Amino acid sequence: MEEFRKEIVFESQNLERETKLTIFGSYGFILLAFPLVGDEYDEQVDCRFVEGVSDYIKNGIFRIVYVPTIENRIWKNGDKSLEERSGLHFKYNSFLVDEVLPKIFKMAGSPTPIITFGCGESGYFAGNSFFRHPDLFYGTILIDAFFDIRRLCGDYFDTNCYFNSPLDFLPKLEEEYWLIHLRTRKHIYLCVDEKDGFSVSQATQLSQILNNKSIKHTFEKYNISSENKFDIWSHIFFDIVKRYF
């Protein structure tokens, strides 16, 4: 896939460092992917997901754009207080909306549909980004994700944490502007390995909330005979892409 790969390197004002977007493909809608390990695209892990859908990329169905995340640099940074980490998460949201999306639209030549994607902890960032901004994103593919920010912040919980915790803010969401966007999105996928009790519980809670809000979505449990998380996640990802795209 190297012939379809390019990078956009830039200085982020919100993250206060140089960062980059890793892009595969030249045409189609955008699959905004959050790295599975670490905060950056990983050649050994993330590449298997790219290779597995290479035909879709080559045929211009979609492009995959890997965006940096903040799990390790911010939430697992013991040198900063939890209040500071929460504040940096706020800046990360601004980074996505004010810096990443304009660069993606410029690359595409116009505003283009964007679906977020992530597994495990990266699934939290993919899901949170979508549910916070359903007016900007067209859907999300979430595999073994969690939706309660307490998984990152522990007992610390401020207003910013609340608005970055879908299991907390979605039940109380009443504004029609956001609900209309959520109810018209056709690509919301909650997928779990049924052997992962925590992920099943998180997805079940979120699915119940979405049902209560009349938000259509697909909730699927998989039984895959493997103990390797990356094998399980890639199997589920390929299945969703094959069946729905």
Identify the residue ranges that each predicted region occupies:
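Non-catalytic cap/lid and distal C-terminal segments of serine-dependent acyl enzymes
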Residues: 1-245
